[in-house]
A protein has these predicted regions:
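Small-residue faces within membrane-embedded alpha-helices
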Residues: 11, 35, 92-95, 120, ...
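Hydrophobic, membrane-inserted alpha-helices
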Residues: 15-17, 95-96, 118-124
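N-terminal cofactor/phosphate-binding cores enriched in small/glycine residues
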Residues: 10, 14, 24-25
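Structural signature of hydrophobic alpha-helical transmembrane segments
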Residues: 2-12, 80-91, 133-145, 236
């Protein structure tokens, strides 16, 4: 099991999301069950990872590397260290707990759990990635689910819900309310979060490309870049 433990943790939520695509919205308990099982698999594997990690040995362990583009130096390179291991476990716990906390959701249940599973998997992928390309890929993958979860299933502030039009009618009774990006709406909060994340993502992308360009190694591999930095007497 330990040979593929990171793959179980990472791809169980993805597999659950794919399975939910083919599930029927008319069977909400089946939808919740699929989400819970996939999250449970990821949690059990994360617990195993947490206790199997050797803190005495330290460093990155349970490493997997799958070449994606040798020409560009891109690979699905996974591994965890003493910091990444508890973060992966925490993400799996939050996903599993989130499934049951949101058990009462009846509005577009299937879509909610699909995006929740994708968000969790992307977050876990960030903590596992030892390749800058995939680290950035998983980071960006988490942005869309966050926007949709906040914008569609989030909650407006009390002040926003009490807004009325010129005739004194509740604005939430109008169609325009759905697309209102006023300062107290959930859509505004979601959009603001995405803008902040995207702005910093551009800065991160520029940094990654500069590292790739000036390292001279033609690779996004974090471990290789770290060793190269040590040889160049660059603090890492």
């Amino acid at each position: 099991m330990s040979d593929y433990i990171l793959l179980y943790i990472l791809f169980a939520p993805f597999a659950g999301a794919i399975a939910l695509i083919f599930a029927s919205n008319r069977q909400p308990m089946l939808v919740r069950g699929i989400a819970a099982v996939s999250a449970g698999i990821s949690l059990v594997a994360s617990l195993y990872l947490f206790y199997a990690y050797d803190p005495v040995k330290g460093g990155f362990q349970f490493i997997h590397k799958f070449e994606w583009s040798r020409q560009l130096g891109i690979a699905l390179h996974l591994g965890v260290d003493g910091i990444g291991t508890p973060l992966v476990l925490a993400s799996s716990i939050l996903l599993f707990a989130g499934i049951f906390v949101s058990w009462h959701i009846k509005d577009r249940t299937k879509e909610f759990y699909i995006w929740l599973l994708i968000l969790a998997a992307a977050t876990i992928g960030v903590f596992m990635s030892l390749d800058l390309f995939f680290l950035y890929f998983f980071y960006e993958m988490s942005v869309i689910p966050m926007y949709l979860l906040l914008g569609m299933w989030g909650s407006h502030t009390k002040k926003y819900l009490e807004m009325t039009d010129q005739e004194g009618l509740k604005q939430r009774d109008s169609v325009g309310f759905i697309f209102n990006f006023a300062a107290n709406s959930k859509e505004y909060a979601a959009m603001k979060l995405v803008l902040f994340l995207s702005a910093w993502a551009v800065v991160a992308l520029m940094g990654i490309l500069l590292i790739y360009r000036y390292s001279g190694l033609n690779t996004f591999d974090i471990l290789q870049l770290r060793e190269h930095a040590k040889l160049m007497n660059i603090p890492v």
